[in-house]
Amino acid sequence: MVDLKITLVNEDGESTISGKGHPLPAPLIFPPIYIFRFTQYQTEGKLWDKNEFQIKSGKIEFDGEEYDIPESKGTWSKDDEENAIDVNLHLFRPPEKFFPKN
């Protein structure tokens, strides 16, 4: 697990999740789906009040690099036993810079 931060912008403003995290395997489809698992995380913003959400834009900060997130649909789910949260992002179009760890 490494430091991971995702910032998402939607109609409710900017929301973030940050902490220790890593990408999870995702199907090889185009445009890509990004799936991340966070532990020891913190959330900020209104987006986390809903389990499903629309994203206008965003960015991933991972291993010293930044990757854009284009318009997308997202979901999240919490695993109370492992004290973890999984974030799934279904991109509507390809990003300018692909996240290579997925």
UniProtKB/Swiss-Prot annotation:
- What does the record give as the function of this protein? Cell-cell adhesion during early development.
Q: Which residues form a coiled coil?
A: none
* GO biological process per UniProt: aggregation involved in sorocarp development; cell-cell adhesion; culmination involved in sorocarp development; DNA damage response
Q: Which gene encodes it?
A: csbA
Alphabetically sorted, this entry's keywords are: Cell adhesion, Glycoprotein
Modification(s) after translation = O-glycosylated.
Q: What is this protein called?
A: Glycoprotein 24A
Q: Where in the cell is it found?
A: Cell surface
Query: What family does the Swiss-Prot or TrEMBL record give for this protein?
Result: Belongs to the csb family.
Q: Is this entry keyworded Glycoprotein?
A: yes
Q: Which GO terms describe its cellular component?
A: cell surface
